[in-house]
Amino acid sequence: MNLNATLIGQLIAFALFVAFCMKYVWPPLIKAIEERQANIANALSSAEKAKQEQADSKVLAEQEIIKAKEEAQKIIDLATKRRNEILESVQADAEVERQRIIEQGHAEIDSERKRVQEELRQKVAALAVAGAERIVGRSVDTAANNDIIDKLVAEL
């Protein structure tokens, strides 16, 4: 092979081109590539961090939901218990009131019955005295009438 001056000139020109590229072109390319790698690494790291935060938030949200459900159940249980207590209290009060009304009714009936019996005794005694006066044909004195009426009332 014949080496001539053109080949040496091309070799020198190529070497200068490579040196120029290594000095001025290559460093900005490497810098841009490294920046992109750093940006991609940061983005992946941020994405992983966001994914972890989302998972943590989901767990916290589920815990809060469970806690809220438990608290709601406690409130419902407390309200149910309070409702039952109120119902029992109202039923007991109603039962007491019912017994009081029944006793009051019985007392009124008894007093009315006694009043009617006493009235009936007095009328029967008065009728008996009136009948006896007619039979006897004379009037007995008032003190004797009252004494006889009291005895009849006591017997009835």
Swiss-Prot record:
It is found in: Cell inner membrane. The chain crosses the membrane at residues 7-26. CDD domains: ATP-synt_Fo_b. InterPro entries: ATP_synth_B-like_membr_sf (IPR028987), ATP_synth_b/b'su_bac/chlpt (IPR002146), ATP_synth_F0_bsu_bac (IPR005864), ATP_synthase_B_chain (IPR050059). GO terms for molecular function: proton-transporting ATP synthase activity, rotational mechanism; proton-transporting ATPase activity, rotational mechanism. It comes from the Bacteria. One of its GO terms (cellular component) is proton-transporting ATP synthase complex. Pfam families: ATP-synt_B. Keywords: ATP synthesis, Cell inner membrane, Cell membrane, CF(0), Hydrogen ion transport, Ion transport, Membrane, Transmembrane, Transmembrane helix, Transport. It is a single-pass membrane protein. F-type ATPases have 2 components, F(1) - the catalytic core - and F(0) - the membrane proton channel. F(1) has five subunits: alpha(3), beta(3), gamma(1), delta(1), epsilon(1). F(0) has three main subunits: a(1), b(2) and c(10-14). The alpha and beta chains form an alternating ring which encloses part of the gamma chain. F(1) is attached to F(0) by a central stalk formed by the gamma and epsilon chains, while a peripheral stalk is formed by the delta and b chains. Belongs to the ATPase B chain family. F(1)F(0) ATP synthase produces ATP from ADP in the presence of a proton or sodium gradient. F-type ATPases consist of two structural domains, F(1) containing the extramembraneous catalytic core and F(0) containing the membrane proton channel, linked together by a central stalk and a peripheral stalk. During catalysis, ATP synthesis in the catalytic domain of F(1) is coupled via a rotary mechanism of the central stalk subunits to proton translocation. This is ATP synthase subunit b.
